[in-house]
């Protein structure tokens, strides 16, 4: 594999060491000053684009250049980190270390002194800083006035920045709030602590003593940002590639379903809100779940927003900002000949695969155990017949194994040229997630209705013979079935970690097709999902230290 590394603009790579406010050309604190960011209309309009580019560019965090880290490609890389901390993404290779996310699978080096946990902190706060820059620049520009067309664009860009910032803080709150688990006790005085808030008004001095805020504070901040986003995005394009009302409503739904689960019980008002906003997206967006043809499309499957009607929000990846190895496709698509995936041989856990009935077309996301079926026409393969033969039989790389993943295709079905195959559209939210949020919320409000909604979704969109859960199912039964369907639906997409953590679900990597070194099991939610704050933050923020950090979970999970 060619290990070509691109050089990128300093505005994308020279960012932050965290929320720490070390003096830089643009402070990591609240935002850039007007001297640092041009007030021209062109500069203002382009600021939001620099943020989206930084979310997906190869080497965007500087970890590739500093440490040779080939998992440094922004949001898609973060989402793959989530997947490797769960149970269903199996590494099946004889040499499992082609899986470059192995530290997350192993639950090793997850403490504050390591880069593995630091990556989350650095990247989300980088994007928050960029959102703050946009907000700090747009607000005075709007106050100064402009012609009608420019004013509309300024407001829409401001709304996008608020939406992006809300998304960042929602992920951070869910990642860093410590939750009870069976392996690593949580000190009583850090329950419900999340992360420091940095907004457009935060100064460098503020950052030097900026504590973790409580759960209620961060979620109110998120809801306030979403309200502002909703206001400023009025009349904005409904394009999948930029925040719009449907994306904002989807973030509301994610936020409220999380708020429905409190440490000492449930909050029914929050479940009502979650159902309301998920329902708004379902009813008002005009979006529809993926069909079987779209799901299994060998050229466009999970890589092309315009090939389906399901995506609410996504990011288009440009070939100019990607290299062969630091990309989503090279780590998740077995059919891509240039990447790590075909050597790591990523697939579904056999335990998950065996739980899927043959009548559910989503089972076609992975090769079955019967090799005679592989060339029978049952499966659709990307590329040419030669590409198919190389993937199945091996040609300069290992041949496919049972349970190998087919879900994520190289762009345009291109299996050989990474410049083409890496330039995918990356999905951040699709309509199916809203159905599942509505189902979960409705169950808490009316169990019979929740079960029926799950049945309706499954029989209409996924498996018309579905009948796995009965009316009157208790919450434990419902939760298990709901999560199973989400595991099948969102495998590899970076959605599920938040479900597992919220629902207090264990992981079980005892399936025979997991690499031996990655086999482990938890009794409840994994302690690894209480992400540890990087020590780099301690060096500049006196309000955070070892005493109020999340406990280090490294090597505290049972190895099988």
Language model features with spans:
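Flexible, polar/acidic helix-loop-strand segments at domain edges
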Residues: 358-429
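Membrane-proximal, proline-rich intrinsically disordered regions
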Residues: 21-81, 331-347, 352-358, 362-367, ...
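Short, surface-exposed recognition loops and adjoining beta-strand edges that mediate ligand/DNA contacts
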Residues: 32-38, 70-77, 176-191, 235, ...
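Inward-facing hydrophobic residues that define packing positions of alpha-helical scaffold repeats
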Residues: 128-131, 219, 226, 271, ...
